From Swiss-Prot:
GN (gene name): OR10A5
Disulfide bonds: C98-C190
Coiled coil (UniProt feature): none
Broad class of the protein's primary localization: membrane
Organism of origin: Homo sapiens
GO cellular component, one term: membrane
Function, as annotated: Odorant receptor (Potential). May be involved in taste perception.
Electron transport found in the keyword field: no
Record membrane topology: Multi-pass membrane protein
Taxonomy of the source species: Eukaryota, Metazoa, Chordata, Craniata, Vertebrata
PROSITE patterns named in the record: G_PROTEIN_RECEP_F1_1, G_PROTEIN_RECEP_F1_2
Protein name: Olfactory receptor 10A5
Amino acid sequence: MAIGNWTEISEFILMSFSSLPTEIQSLLFLTFLTIYLVTLKGNSLIILVTLADPMLHSPMYFFLRNLSFLEIGFNLVIVPKMLGTLLAQDTTISFLGCATQMYFFFFFGVAECFLLATMAYDRYVAICSPLHYPVIMNQRTRAKLAAASWFPGFPVATVQTTWLFSFPFCGTNKVNHFFCDSPPVLKLVCADTALFEIYAIVGTILVVMIPCLLILCSYTRIAAAILKIPSAKGKHKAFSTCSSHLLVVSLFYISSSLTYFWPKSNNSPESKKLLSLSYTVVTPMLNPIIYSLRNSEVKNALSRTFHKVLALRNCIP
């Protein structure tokens, strides 16, 4: 329905990787499908193992379980639709579908930032106050910290998504991305978005920088505590408990920061798609691999669980 020069848009078209040849898109489909399945299986396995094995009923693995839930949600929001655009060329997404995808993208993204900060604090308490660790990080405290990590996603996602989709859209309805991210959708708005853009920039900086500063503060104190440990074996053991989390934090923050804080003149739509893939598709797959390969407790728990499953199968006639 036309209103002046504005057109009421009922759906959007995700350009995804349509500029690439069909053969390349087919290859991308197989690649992303494999990554998607590995992500779901890997994170589901982390959840099941940390629940089933009594040795992993500590605060560290409680937060790791939360991270795995989050990564599964991230993948379910982004990847299925992207696979549809590559396989069946189903590039359309409804107005409500686009808003819903953007909402949950913001929700899971913000939650991950704060959850990574909470996990860093957990490591700080474990290394700097080992004797008081069970008391400080009791069941009630860890539940509160987890809730505090998930909660900020709700107001941020609600305000940003509701505000953006209250603007009128005109002209093209083509979103030059593989999902409904804020910057490419904002380009389709035919109204003054200066105030929204200021809010988005300030909000993004706060959401990224506050958890990042908390992580840096935690690891600065952790590093100081590790340096005071007299034995090399003790230092190695303390560092090994943090190395997996540090690697996960680095992957997430470097890729997301390059996407949203890199100068626009140096960041083409295609390069932004690649950067977005790193933290929406690749990082969720790598997290369970990093934690399982670099953590002996998780590896041992996986081995115990595997042997229990084999034993149960052998008992069944």
